[in-house]
Amino acid sequence: MKKIMLLLMTLLLVSLPLAQEAQADASVYSYQGIISHMAPPASPPAKPKTPVEKKNAAQIDQYIQGLDYDKNNILVYDGEAVKNVPPKAGYKEGNQYIVVEKKKKSINQNNADIQVINSLASLTYPGALVKANSELVENQPDVLPVKRDSVTLSIDLPGMVNHDNEIVVQNATKSNINDGVNTLVDRWNNKYSEEYPNISAKIDYDQEMAYSESQLVAKFGAAFKAVNNSLNVNFGAISEGKVQEEVINFKQIYYTVNVNEPTSPSRFFGKSVTKENLQALGVNAENPPAYISSVAYGRDIFVKLSTSSHSTRVKAAFDTAFKGKSVKGDTELENIIQNASFKAVIYGGSAKDEVEIIDGDLSKLRDILKQGANFDKKNPGVPIAYTTNFLKDNQLAVVKNNSEYIETTSKAYSDGKINLDHSGAYVARFNVTWDEVSYDANGNEVVEHKKWSENDKDKLAHFTTSIYLPGNARNINIHAKECTGLAWEWWRTVVDDRNLPLVKNRNVCIWGTTLYPAYSDTVDNPIK
């Protein structure tokens, strides 16, 4: 009997840990859904690996950490190379003479943030594994189709406590990650939005006067190519000096979702993934693995400002209009703004998730920028930018953009006139000469001497006339003399003004008597 009792007690003691282990397994399995909704740890818990899985992980870590590449030069965009600079040129346009000048310029920009537009949004999610290669530079990330382990996401919306801003995604596929992001946003909307009713978007904007597509791609990233299909920057007219355009990228960032850094490269892969799998997918030193470490969600606006003005203050006028500052009292800036237009391409900021294109005059621009300034349920964010880190060492992957381009500047010289007025008691003669400047095919200045057809002809009082001069007139000389009737000084000089600048209205008047002539030279509305 004692033996039987001893046997029963032994069986009971053995079965108790087995039951506890089975219960623990069931508990683990119950949390193997897509997303853990409990407060997650700082990094996702990992199941013990089998010997084969440990070997796979060790080989992956050794392979990726052994890849030899220069992180500063693997993501490089080399745009246009300018060999020949077109010469200076000039042409007549209405009542102005336009001088167009070209200069070789270069732009070198390091971009840690990569723009997202709607056509790429499906490829962009926090934690995505991509190759750091030319496709990433061109904003066409090559996502690695491998099985994934769990990742921890965090969001930077305010007020979230007790790890409410974090979530563990057990199987980091695109759909599961997106579900995780939506869960974080819903959690904030349900628990914290009433306490923080007006979350102002973080504002980030950059701007560049437009000269070539290569220049703007270097400035804003490869996404600009697709944006310009709607923006339609008129590079041809810009090159001819007929228009001036500026492109502004205005981001309203509602929130950013980050991915916890992996403690080792293998931590981002499913346990069945091998080094050979990665090699077969083309992962090597020329195509090292990287991951999308953060994604900014919000509203992204590209604005093109355009004017046919040849003023050198166009950029100042555009900047003033964009910032909503007053230009009252500055006639030149007022005229530029009143005669300028804009075109905006808007991504995000509405529940419809559509791309919006708006045209108008600059007075309406500020209203568009104010829309979507706050994050709420009516203004859901879309992916607008992302950053990538190298999986080897979690170092930031920066895209180096370089391009040369031709900067085109134009200057308008308005036509002017000289008004002659003779009311003196004598016979007078005028002599008016000037130079007209143009440019040959090589950009060399060509100077042609001109003179008034009525030079040195007798004029009796009261005589008036106007001599119209083109905008390229320079070195204006005005000479007037009067007949005194004196044998020893038959002609006396009244006016001898030389190398005068062209102005809108120059009034030269002579009067008086043969012995006491007089004159005046006044200017109305001088041309600046």
Curated annotation (Swiss-Prot):
Residues 1-23 form the signal peptide. The chain crosses the membrane at residues 213-226, 233-242, 311-320, 328-340. A motif (Conserved undecapeptide) lies at residues 482-492. One of its GO terms (cellular component) is extracellular region. Coiled coil: none annotated. Pfam families: Thiol_cytolys_C, Thiol_cytolysin. One of its GO terms (biological process) is killing of cells of another organism. Keywords: Cytolysis, Hemolysis, Host membrane, Lipid-binding, Membrane, Secreted, Signal, Toxin, Transmembrane, Transmembrane beta strand, Virulence. It is a multi-pass membrane protein. It is found in: Secreted; Host membrane. A motif (Cholesterol binding) lies at residues 514-515. GO terms for molecular function: cholesterol binding; toxin activity. Homooligomeric pore complex of 35 to 50 subunits; when inserted in the host membrane. Belongs to the cholesterol-dependent cytolysin family. A cholesterol-dependent toxin that causes cytolysis by forming pores in cholesterol containing host membranes. After binding to target membranes, the protein undergoes a major conformation change, leading to its insertion in the host membrane and formation of an oligomeric pore complex. Cholesterol is required for binding to host membranes, membrane insertion and pore formation; cholesterol binding is mediated by a Thr-Leu pair in the C-terminus. Can be reversibly inactivated by oxidation. This is Ivanolysin.
